[in-house]
């Protein structure tokens, strides 16, 4: 490859702001950057004395540079983020975080439902959040259900009940589905209390409850007064647990940051309306020799500009690490329509939370490094046990079904950092005889390997959860496709052995040779890990498919029972479970249901 002619290239570069993309000889984007002054920034790559080892390595691979001029720095920042997201360049810091952020959702209904929501905000209603993870949302919902027991059931369940459910009996739902238990006004008031609570207006809620308690007491309704008193006490306990301080009543993100030995961790403490919603650790993928400031600023840009994941921009971002924040501050201010500030090393309560975030970042990084070392050591042990020069990628397949029903196959992927969950796949198996595991394995492998694979996606080992029969079938399929592969994977079956005990697995080669490893072998532990991941991934997929089928009411398959009669049956008897318990006489009392049809319905439900 002829060297890149930087002098000729720089003659045509402008001094305006913009974004540049660097390509290697294979026309792959290897780096994306932005600049206030494109000419000045790009010239810096071709100086004789480049201090950064990473930049030196990057420059040796440049074959072409494309430039996009923008009107403002903010436009350049957003375009840079979009290009990084699109191309995932080798020399950029990459935020490995493709999960959407969950919200608490209150539906737009006569009797609103409260639930967890992920993804696009299409439903009509109110969204509160986002929360850093689903665990934080579940904790909040559990708490809300204790304080303000509004319904969490699906609208279809709500519409088909006329008896209170178990949640009402244990005091976790006000049962708006049943007339006469709670008035529309009282239910609406509890819903409004939730809105205020989620907005951080706890004192307003407590003040309103205190007034109600005093009113009930003056009216000599002591039972109601005692119920409200208990609700107030619960609210005050929650305040003690969640309250930060008046000075932190803004929306804050507190970021702890640490980097050691090529690993970085940013720990996010999310505070909204003066309450800690939760925290989360991020481990961006960083090229070797990357400067600390580039790691941190790249993370912030990718994290806050990634609108598709449902993130919100806080009023203030607090950090202990100093970096050039002016451009990002300006971009976030323009995007959010309000002033966004980055604050360095504050005092008081904010300082205490910053110290906590830094401590958590260090702790999470240490844990990650230890885990990475353990996985690496297991890979090395496995290479030695199987006499392989290097293992970069492994895939494992498993099949799950119940008596041949809803067969699902799974494929899980491991590399030298452990499970690569973003590459896990499930395959719904169709067109085979129920229970034919050999045919199921053949189908999933055909679907997996019949397509053209990138070199780095070709596994070094393919594990099959099964014995000789499964392994031979797998070999017959895979060998049809590996003709043009630069390497051929080792195929291994994982048989459970005679006793079927964990730690006594038998490994099977395609030659028919069987061998085992000591139960305390790190190599065996790695094999067990990938096998268990594949097994669990297949089972969870199968259960979801099976539940989907069984959730479809048996009533849909009974001749003579159309949508109107189905709705009448469910409404009159209070749901499918109550209908299953009902006698023929009770079923025949439903409007439009004759005795003969009632008998047919009961028979069908017993068989279902």
UniProtKB/Swiss-Prot annotation:
GO function term, MF aspect, one: excinuclease ABC activity
GO cellular component, one term: cytoplasm
Single GO biological process annotation from the record: SOS response
Keyword Nucleotide-binding on entry: no
InterPro entries: GIY-YIG_endonuc, GIY-YIG_endonuc_sf, GIY-YIG_UvrC_Cho, Hlx-hairpin-Hlx_DNA-bd_motif, RuvA_2-like, UVR_dom, UVR_dom_sf, UvrABC_protein_C
Location(s), subcellular: Cytoplasm
Keywords: Cytoplasm, DNA damage, DNA excision, DNA repair, Excision nuclease, SOS response
Name of one Pfam family that matches: UvrC_RNaseH
Domain named GIY-YIG: residues: 15-93
Predominant cellular place of this UniProt entry's protein: cytoplasm
Start and end residues of each UVR domain: 203-238
Keyword DNA repair: yes
Family assignment from sequence similarity: Belongs to the UvrC family.
Assembly mode: Interacts with UvrB in an incision complex.
Function: The UvrABC repair system catalyzes the recognition and processing of DNA lesions. UvrC both incises the 5' and 3' sides of the lesion. The N-terminal half is responsible for the 3' incision and the C-terminal half is responsible for the 5' incision.
Name assigned to this protein: UvrABC system protein C
Gene: uvrC
């Amino acid at each position: 490859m002829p060297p890149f002619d930087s002098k000729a290239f720089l003659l045509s570069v402008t001094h305006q702001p913009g974004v540049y993309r660097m390509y290697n000889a294979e026309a792959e984007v290897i780096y994306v950057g932005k600049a206030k002054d494109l000419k000045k920034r790009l010239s810096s790559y071709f100086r004789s004395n480049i201090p950064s080892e990473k930049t030196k390595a990057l420059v040796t691979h440049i074959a072409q540079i494309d430039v996009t001029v923008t009107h403002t720095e903010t436009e350049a920042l957003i375009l840079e983020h979009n290009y990084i997201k699109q191309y995932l360049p080798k020399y950029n810091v990459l935020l490995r975080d493709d999960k959407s952020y969950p919200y608490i959702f209150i539906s737009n209904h006569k009797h609103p439902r409260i639930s967890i929501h992920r993804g696009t905000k299409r439903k009509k209603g109110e969204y509160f959040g986002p929360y850093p993870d689903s665990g934080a949302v579940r904790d909040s919902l559990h708490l809300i259900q204790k304080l303000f027991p509004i319904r969490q059931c699906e609208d279809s369940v709500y519409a088909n009940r006329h008896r209170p459910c178990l949640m009402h009996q244990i005091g976790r739902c006000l049962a708006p589905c049943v007339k006469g238990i709670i008035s529309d006004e009282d239910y609406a008031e509890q819903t409004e209390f939730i809105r205020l609570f989620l907005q951080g207006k706890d004192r307003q809620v407590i003040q309103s409850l205190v007034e109600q308690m005093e009113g009930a007491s003056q009216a000599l309704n002591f039972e109601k007064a005692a119920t409200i008193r208990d609700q107030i006490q619960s609210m005050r306990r929650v305040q003690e647990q969640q309250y930060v301080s008046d000075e932190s009543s803004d929306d804050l993100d507190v970021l702890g940051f640490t980097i050691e030995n090529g690993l970085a961790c940013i720990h996010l403490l999310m505070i909204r309306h003066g309450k800690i919603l939760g925290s989360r650790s991020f481990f961006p993928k960083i090229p070797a020799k990357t400067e600390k400031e580039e790691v941190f600023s790249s993370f912030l840009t990718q994290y806050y500009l990634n609108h598709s994941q449902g993130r919100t921009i806080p009023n203030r971002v607090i950090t202990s690490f100093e970096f050039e924040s002016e451009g990002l501050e300006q971009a976030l201010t323009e995007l959010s329509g309000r002033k966004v500030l980055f604050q360095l090393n504050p005092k008081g309560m904010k300082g205490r939370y910053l110290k906590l975030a830094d401590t958590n970042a260090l702790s999470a990084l240490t844990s990650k490094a230890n885990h990475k070392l353990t996985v690496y050591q297991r890979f090395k042990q496995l290479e030695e046990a199987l006499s392989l020069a290097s293992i970069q990628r492994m895939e494992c397949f498993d099949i799950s079904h119940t008596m041949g029903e809803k067969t699902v196959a799974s494929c899980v992927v491991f590399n030298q950092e452990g499970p690569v969950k973003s590459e896990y796949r499930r395959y719904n198996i169709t067109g085979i005889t129920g229970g034919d595991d050999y045919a199921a394995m053949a189908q999933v492998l055909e679907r997996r390997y019949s397509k053209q694979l990138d070199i780095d996606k070709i596994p070094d080992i393919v594990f099959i959860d099964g014995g000789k029969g499964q392994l031979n079938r797998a070999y017959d399929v895979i060998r049809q496709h590996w003709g043009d592969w630069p390497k051929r994977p080792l195929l291994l079956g994982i048989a459970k052995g005679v006793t079927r005990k964990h730690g006594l697995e038998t490994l099977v080669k395609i030659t028919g040779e069987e061998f085992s490893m000591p139960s305390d072998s790190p190599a065996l532990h790695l094999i067990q890990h990938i096998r268990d991941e594949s097994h669990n991934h297949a089972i969870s997929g199968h259960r979801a498919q099976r539940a989907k089928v069984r959730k479809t009411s048996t009533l849909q398959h009974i001749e003579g029972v159309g949508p109107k009669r189905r709705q009448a049956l469910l409404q009159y008897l209070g749901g499918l479970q109550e209908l299953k318990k009902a006698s023929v006489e009770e079923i025949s009392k439903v409007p439009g249901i004759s005795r003969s049809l009632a008998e047919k319905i009961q028979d069908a439900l017993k068989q279902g």
